[in-house]
Amino acid sequence: MTLLLVWLIFTGVAGEIRLEAEDGELLGVAVDSTLTGYSGRGYVTGFDAPEDSVRFSFEAPRGVYRVVFGVSFSSRFASYALRVDDWHQTGSLIKRGGGFFEASIGEIWLDEGAHTMAFQLMNGALDYVRLEPVSYGPPARPPAQLSDSQATASAQALFAFLLSEYGRHILAGQQQNPYRRDFDAINYVRNVTGKEPALVSFDLIDYSPTREAHGVVHYQTPEDWIAWAGRDGIVSLMWHWNAPTDLIEDPSQDCYWWYGFYTRCTTFDVAAALADTSSERYRLLLRDIDVIAAQLQKFQQADIPVLWRPLHEAAGGWFWWGAKGPEPFKQLWRLLYERLVHHHGLHNLIWVYTHEPGAAEWYPGDAYVDIVGRDVYADDPDALMRSDWNELQTLFGGRKLVALTETGTLPDVEVITDYGIWWSWFSIWTDPFLRDVDPDRLTRVYHSERVLTRDELPDWRSYVLHATTVQPAGDLALAVYPNPGAGRLHVEVGLPVAAPVVVEVFNLLGQRVFQYQAGMQPAGLWRRAFELALAPGVYLVQVRAGNLVARRRWVSVR
């Protein structure tokens, strides 16, 4: 057996790491030079058995790396297996060309220090491995403007502070259980980490009239939450709104009055109620909103701005306010906004909308939303939540702050921020989710230089919101070819920073005839090819990358 360990040592700024296959540890494979077009002294082949592999040892600076293989194989597909330290991935590579070519299997995150890699390519040849550093920039900041033009000075200051920290720090947040007389979640975090969350989310659930009608006990009150906030703590409020009427009381369906916010435990029809403003059920909607307004008024009187997150997770359909589809939901959201802001004069609210995947049509509109959140309950405690972040950046990047408004796990902040994932804040759901988080992970995150805890908050009330209009920072370097083209369109764009990329094609009437959302892409050259079944004519190709945009004319021929 050939045995050769290679250690690559890098210092300073992360550079490309190149591992020549023939310099690795060869297990059941051999160096060959029969084929042409390889680099170095040869390539490695003979991956015939499952245990055959080439292994490397190397050192790397901390960061995100794109993994690229120089390979060759004769079949259309070749199966591979890659292990880097404890991380493992399998898949198939698609043949391109007749000799050696480069194939990428995506990105990995490496901590600073020593690493090991093992690679298998069944019935193929490995020339080299490249680890190409990828740098992600911060998210684009939205305009410094709240939806409520009469927002209180403290609400404006809090929003200005959140804007200033977006892409620099993530605020540590925690959901508090409303059924404990003590602040058990906050106390647990303090006991484990020695710190308190900068932001705590409380629930107005038991102030719903159909819960109070059953004599519900208020274990915590807005006065308690105001006392916790003091002058510097940040308050978020949600509302599990028990349906205004028509609750199902049926133990055989596991339905009781206290489950009245679930679609399955009420027959209340929000669409019908909204359609008839003279109906009793519409009046009950207003009654409930007015009751909650009285509780929110306490925060305004105490000069406590509120990150107000009502009607959450509507597109999931499991709550009655989302049971009838997007249009009644948006109508209810706007009614709630108008009633609280303009009827009750509540100007201390920063409105937080909770987005669900693939539910863009549920968005109430920029005029009614200040921040967009996402509630994520991942099975994997190490989940990066990249797809959630990328979707939100594609839809709202440069328009709205984005927050992880609920999470059942706690992502490793050092890792996700290297991927350019900078939530405005995270909020861990209460037990059992909070106690399921590894205490070491909780402590590391709370002590991270990329996270702000309560003791690290500045005097955010001194921040000033300067309304601005975000303008494109410049043109993108965009190329489209062949031009003219017969159905196949190639797009190449140089991305100065990581950004969500959207490709659109418009006809001369201004109608969009094609759209492709690529999600968040790293800085550098980005290219795609598209098969377009378009009539002959002149089209406009537009590429948006965050708040950058470029357009080119393209001619389609047969």
Curated annotation (Swiss-Prot):
Optimum pH is 5.4. Pfam families: Glyco_hydro_26 (PF02156). The active site is at E313 (proton donor), E406 (nucleophile). GO terms for molecular function: carbohydrate binding; mannan endo-1,4-beta-mannosidase activity. It catalyses: Random hydrolysis of (1->4)-beta-D-mannosidic linkages in mannans, galactomannans and glucomannans. Belongs to the glycosyl hydrolase 26 family. This is Mannan endo-1,4-beta-mannosidase. The lineage of its organism: Bacteria, Pseudomonadati, Rhodothermota, Rhodothermia, Rhodothermales.
